[in-house]
UniProtKB/Swiss-Prot annotation:
Cofactor section: [4Fe-4S] cluster
Something else known: Reaction proceeds by a ping-pong mechanism involving intermediate methylation of a conserved cysteine residue.
Lineage: Bacteria, Pseudomonadati, Myxococcota, Myxococcia, Myxococcales
Enzyme Commission no: 2.1.1.192
Pfam families: Radical_SAM, RlmN_N
GO molecular function: 4 iron, 4 sulfur cluster binding; metal ion binding; rRNA (adenine(2503)-C2-)-methyltransferase activity; rRNA binding; tRNA (adenine(37)-C2)-methyltransferase activity; tRNA binding
Family of this protein: Belongs to the radical SAM superfamily. RlmN family.
Function: Specifically methylates position 2 of adenine 2503 in 23S rRNA and position 2 of adenine 37 in tRNAs. m2A2503 modification seems to play a crucial role in the proofreading step occurring at the peptidyl transferase center and thus would serve to optimize ribosomal fidelity.
Keyword Iron-sulfur: yes
GO CC annotations, alphabetized: cytoplasm
Every Radical SAM core domain range: 119-355
Cofactor-binding details, from the entry: Binds 1 [4Fe-4S] cluster. The cluster is coordinated with 3 cysteines and an exchangeable S-adenosyl-L-methionine.
Protein name: Dual-specificity RNA methyltransferase RlmN 2
Binding site for S-adenosyl-L-methionine: G188, E189, S220, S242, L243, N244, N318
């Protein structure tokens, strides 16, 4: 039998190299999930998990090299199997009232925004949960973007870590966590990204993490009724409802979600919401001139909210180009508030922060994207 030469063998394409194992986004893991990863995937003892977790979420480490009390071998294992997904600061815009809007670039080239609002007694961060938003509220600039994607738990939490670092650097704070309050009222509908929000909240409230109290975290929703029930059962932070109208006709014109879950369904969910002793649901009501700011609106609002422990935040509309709405004047806003107060509804006119940098309520839309380190608002 003749030998077969190498040149006579059939020509075949080389087999592709095996795809590299996907790295684990380690900062998106709850402490329980991190413990499983450390013991089952890395073969390490369980006590290493809270050690790594504290580096990530108390100290805000952005690389495994910073974790100096871990062995070199463990750090090598982490580099081989896991990653810390970065948020890169694209720019910061400073308002005359002290508010700072931060724009972050994600690894896939998307942009999100967070707004830092310092006052004498608190330092609050407004956090985003999505790139864009699917809710399409007619008075909100974020709604004009559409939904690009959900943020991961690590991208939600990274906003908090990054602003903590900025505040420590800029204001000279020695504490690892100068921020006192978090409001999930930035880009996106938080309950539309509920699983990632829930994981982020567990990280932010962990004693091995930033350790925010449930009293100092508020999540706002346009009214995804089925998710409000889950939110009440599976988290313990405060709830805010973006209402903005006193009739279904009004609300459906500006908030498409109302066509699926109307005001009656929304308020029924609020009446069933489990509230801690002494806690109230916040209702946000954007005052739009000639649309929802009449005396009749205030009286209807009083009737709608009966039986619900509430406070109402009245928010003078922040005008956005091209949306066709105008803000209610200060005098009219005060008259509206007084009617609510006479009806035994606790109501407050919220001072808008960051309007001059498009950082106020309803203005976040990545306008004026710039390169890192610049301060342009154009």
């Amino acid at each position: 039998m003749s030998e077969t030469s190498a040149t006579s063998l059939p020509v075949t394409e080389p087999l592709p190299a095996p795809a590299p194992a996907k790295l684990v986004d380690v900062a998106s893991l709850s402490l329980e999930a991190l413990s499983r990863f450390v013991t089952e995937e890395l073969g390490e003892r369980a006590f290493r998990a809270p050690q790594i977790y504290r580096w990530l979420h108390q100290r805000g480490a952005t690389s495994f090299d910073e974790m100096t009390d871990l062995s070199k071998v463990l750090r090598e294992k982490l580099r081989a199997r896991a990653e810390i997904v970065p948020l890169v600061k694209d720019c910061e815009l400073r308002s005359t009232d002290g508010t700072i809007k931060y724009r972050w670039k994600t690894r896939d080239g998307r942009y999100i925004e967070s707004v830092y609002m310092p006052t004498e007694d608190r330092r609050t961060l407004c956090v985003s949960t999505q790139v864009g938003c699917a809710m399409a509220c007619g008075f909100c600039m974020t709604g004009t973007m559409g939904l690009k994607r959900n943020l991961t738990p690590s991208e939600i939490v990274a906003q908090v870590h990054a602003v903590n670092r900025e505040v420590r650097k800029n204001e000279g704070h020695e504490t690892l966590r100068p921020l006192s309050n978090l409001v999930f009222m930035g880009m996106g509908e938080p309950l539309h990204n509920f699983e990632n929000l829930k994981t982020a909240l567990s990280i932010l409230q962990s004693e091995d993490g930033p350790n925010f109290s449930h009293r100092h975290i508020t999540v706002s929703t346009v009214g995804l009724v089925p998710m409000i029930e889950r939110f009440g059962k599976e988290t313990d932070v405060k709830l805010a409802i973006s209402l903005n109208a006193s009739t279904d006709e009004q609300r459906s014109k500006t908030m498409p979600v109302n066509r699926k879950w109307n005001i009656a369904a929304l308020l029924d969910a609020c009446r069933k919401f489990p509230l801690r002793q002494g806690r109230r649901i916040t209702f946000e009501y954007v005052l739009i001139k000639g649309f929802n700011d009449a005396d009749e609106d205030a009286h209807r609002l009083i009737e709608l909210l009966k039986g619900i422990p509430v406070k109402v935040n009245l928010i003078p509309y922040n005008e956005n180009p091209g949306l066709g709405f105008h803000t209610t004047g200060e005098e009219r806003a005060e008259e509206f508030r007084a009617i609510l107060a006479d009806g035994h509804v606790a109501a407050y006119i919220r001072r808008n922060r960051g309007r001059d940098i498009a950082g106020a309520c309803g203005q976040l839309a990545n306008r004026g994207e710039t390169q890192a380190g610049t301060d342009s608002t154009t």
